[in-house]
Amino acid sequence: MKTSKEITINKKNKFGAEILCIGSEILLGNIVNTNSQWIAEQLAILGIPHFRQTVIGDNPARLEEAILEASNRSEILITTGGLGPTPDDITTKVIADTFKTPLEQRNDILIDLRNKSKDKDSKLSDSQKKQSLVPKGAKIINNYSGTAPGIYWSPKENFTILTFPGVPSELKEMWAKEASKLLISNNLSKEVISSKVLHFAGISESLLADKIPHLLISKNPTVATYARTGEVKVRITAKGENSEETNRLIEPIKKELTQITGLKCFGIDNETLEEIVFKLLLKRKETIAVAESCTGGGIGSKLTKIPGSSKIFHGGVIAYNNSIKQRLLGVPEEIINTHGAVSKPVVESMARGVQIKFKVNWAISVSGIAGPTGGSKSKPVGLVNFCIKGPKTLITWEENFGSNKTREDIQKLSVLNALDRLRLSIIMAN
């Protein structure tokens, strides 16, 4: 799998891509527009700069105006929404009208619609057939999960439109299987933009930025930091005449970053913490089990999303109730009564118990107060205790993620913190 992507960018007056999301339900705030964020991430992965995101309601005149404006300033316009059989699905027709191009009915789309119809013997309705109309000369972006296909079309010089349905799962599948490949293969110039993303844990964005001020002012490659819950990303982006040149520019920056930050850097491009933990345990031929309270199985869920995780993950106990901690994990009642469920002695006992129960090399336990209620002056919301028990390792620690965080944030931070400490513990055990 490629760890950096590239695409050529035209050097004429127009530059980059923009995103246009269509639908009155987005404009009115009835649904959250996650498509723009996801497309922006994909453009960054491909190395395509983008400078504008717009939301337009289901209004033909305003939609045509937005499309015309985009065609005069950008090379690529990506739209979501407004594809389908209903009257407010106007995107394809408005695009065709904007560039004075007739719509043509595509037999291949009609066949696909019939195959996807529940009643294959009945005739398609006019509203269903509407989805088979595309601007003359446009390529089809097949919809594998839904009925409305998208288009890939260059209606004028140095301008390409890609359309997608508004359903996120359909958009993502169409992008992965066809659209991203079309963007990469249809080169527009000899200039190449390549990027590589480094992932960091256990360090804040500001502290990381303080360590690399000389890199952040670099022009080619550019270096930028991005903070996410429990993680910081650094994107290195380079321009050149070919991928060999851009990779030569990126490599020394990447090397310097990892030297400065050491083990704080846990992955590159699409690597996740749980994948790194999985690979480390697999290499050592070791196994793990989890005992979770406030995270509700979040650590186990992360690990079991990885194909083949049964080779290293034996199981877990979600011990939310104190009686379960005692009965299934063997935590002594007196320890809970003396120290409280959220304490280092309790998580140590949980880790020992789950390690014995599942006969594994490694065990990790967590107990905390995720809120918004249940906190006290001595044990506030956001306080979480952890333990890692390995073949020759025993670590307990406490984190206070803050009472201003949401329950979901505290759970997510706890899971990521646990996985990162586990990663470091396994590395140190080598």
UniProtKB/Swiss-Prot annotation:
Entry-linked Pfam families: CinA, CinA_KH, MoCF_biosynth
Superkingdom classification of source: Bacteria
Signal peptide positions (record): none
InterPro entries given in the database record: CinA (IPR050101), CinA-like_C (IPR036653), CinA_C (IPR008136), CinA_KH (IPR041424), Competence-induced_CinA (IPR008135), MoaB/Mog-like_dom_sf (IPR036425), MoaB/Mog_dom (IPR001453)
CDD domains: cinA
Assigned protein family: Belongs to the CinA family.
Record-linked PANTHER family: NICOTINAMIDE-NUCLEOTIDE AMIDOHYDROLASE PNCC, NMN AMIDOHYDROLASE-LIKE PROTEIN YFAY
Protein name according to UniProt: CinA-like protein
